[in-house]
Amino acid sequence: IQRAGGSEKDLGPLFMLASGLVILFQLPLARFARRVGAVRILPVGFLLIAVSFLSVALFAPSEPAAGWLRLLPAACFVTLLTTGQMLLVPAGKDVVPWFASEATLGAHYGALATAGGCAVLAGNLLLGDLLDRALTPSVGAMYPWLVLAVFPFCSALAMVVICRPMRRPRA
């Protein structure tokens, strides 16, 4: 938003977009995710998040468009990120019982939430300054977004490996 010459007032429409997506699509996507299965949806959710960062990287070398179109990169980011999250959250909760016994199920759900929060915090602390390099339109402005895309992409690959045993029924 800042790169596009926007301000805090431009956050409102983006929050409305995210809220609208959740209101309209959270339940249908959760049903879809459960029908397809967490084993397949977890990698897809992480890939959507990776693509959200890639979408901003694609716009980074160009001067921002005029008018409301200047928010297009942010709208793409919010849409893809939110959709990825709407797939990941129910799928992630669905796989927790695979790793936990009945007695420790609550602790495992708490650990899942804590791990997500810690990942966001660590990402902001370690990579937040990197985004300052993305403020001026240039080819170099793509790199911070590409770096950020690597982490959910690696998570998607990890989910393929981690979830492989879940494709077979437990004995």
Region spans (language model):
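A membrane-interface helix-boundary motif in multi-pass transporters
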Residues: 129-153
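Short amphipathic helix-loop junctions that connect adjacent transmembrane helices
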Residues: 1-11, 132
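Helix-to-loop junctions at the C-terminal end of transmembrane segments
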Residues: 24-39, 131-132
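Hydrophobic core of transmembrane alpha-helices in multi-pass small-molecule transporters
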Residues: 67-87
